Amino acid sequence: MKRAFTPIPYAVALLFYSCLNSFADKAVQDSTSPSPSSNGPPERPYYLTGDEAVWKTFPGKPALGSAIDQADLLITLSIQASRNEDQKNEALRDRKYSIKLVTDVIDTDFETKYPNVFKVLTNADIDSYFVNTMIKKTNARLRPFVQHPTLVTPLFDVGDFSYPSGHASGTELQARILAKLFPKQEDALLRRVRQIADSRVVAGVHYTSDTEPVWLWATWSLRRSKRNLDFRRISEMPRRKIN
């Protein structure tokens, strides 16, 4: 189930870069913010407010019975019938969401070696979790194995709603941030993100259309990003050592 990545529109990439500036600026100021991947759900977003206009106009889930919805089910059933042991094992390894799913591409000891960058990723992850949960509740799309319990057999059980995938959107955001700091690793980072997203479909816990909202990383441009000294300091350090 290999699919090519969608190229980043240049204008959106510029907007995303400006938001990264504010990410690092605030992250360096506050190192105690909890991460949803380690300390439970956040009570509020970190950089965003959650009230940005884009969330109110975000495209909704595919309608039940629509062409996309029917195609989703057919893809899910086809993959379920053909998934091999390697694919199943990969899906099980990627089952639990963590920033490490992406940072391991750079270094398995990333948090220790690059603590300032890890702060940025952790705080961005708070926003990703908060906004993704909000959109999931609005759309209330049932998981494939919940919507079609007699047809879809998941590799493991998952709670909450299906659209959009938190694994796909969260790791996409992490990869886009890291690609700015480690440009030579961009292809490897994006391949890893696609692998994680595909594993969610292999596991039967997401439809394909749930895992392709590469929109999330671009929306951080909504946040003001005038204070950028800290990010500039971090982004210039890969030539020597990011710490």
Task: Tell where the protein language model's regions lie, with residue ranges.
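Bacterial N-terminal signal peptides that target proteins for export
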Residues: M1-P9
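Hydrophobic alpha-helical bundle signature of multipass membrane enzymes
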Residues: K26-A203, R224-R227
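Alpha-helical transmembrane segments that form the membrane-embedded catalytic/substrate-binding core
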Residues: H167-T171, H206-K241
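Short, conserved aromatic-histidine micro-motifs
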Residues: R191-R194, D198, I234-N243
